[in-house]
């Protein structure tokens, strides 16, 4: 018996098989519940930072921050942390990381454990901030932002 954070019902374990990801455990495709919760944590952190440092009004933190400033803080967090460390704060808390993923003529890219780099992180971040690419998935369970950047979110 698992929770929604552990992933979907059986039969969904083949997500990431085309990328050479493990079927379960570390290195396997991250379940949607964990990815969504990591996103909520990252957005909340961005909202807190934007309201603390870039607001001149009073009231609850979720009302003080300008939405575009919050989006900018979110984008900078994603770009720098994913590009250099391979995870955001939300990913780290939920045991996830972003890895390079894709195919070569010899098969799937091996996981070298390194962060995706700033170039891949920039593509991923721009598309993530546009929202629509992030909610359209391929057969491996990756959003179009990850597919376009050549990345995948996996369990640590």
Model-flagged regions — what are they?
Residues 1-156:
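Membrane-interfacial and juxtamembrane segments of integral membrane proteins
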């Amino acid at each position: 018996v698992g929770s929604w954070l552990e992933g979907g019902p059986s039969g969904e374990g083949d997500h990431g098989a085309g990328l050479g990801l493990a079927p379960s455990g570390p290195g396997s495709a991250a379940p949607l519940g964990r990815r969504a919760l990591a996103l909520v944590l990252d957005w909340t952190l961005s909202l807190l930072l934007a309201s603390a440092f870039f607001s001149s009004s009073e009231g609850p933190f979720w009302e003080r921050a300008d939405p575009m400033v919050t989006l900018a803080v979110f984008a900078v967090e994603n770009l720098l942390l994913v590009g250099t460390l391979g995870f955001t704060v939300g990913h780290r808390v939920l045991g996830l990381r972003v890895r390079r993923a894709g195919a070569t003529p010899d098969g799937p890219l091996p996981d070298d454990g390194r962060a995706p780099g700033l170039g891949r992180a920039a593509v991923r971040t721009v598309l993530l901030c546009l929202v629509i690419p992030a909610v359209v998935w391929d057969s491996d369970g990756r959003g179009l932002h990850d597919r376009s950047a050549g990345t995948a979110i996996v369990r640590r």
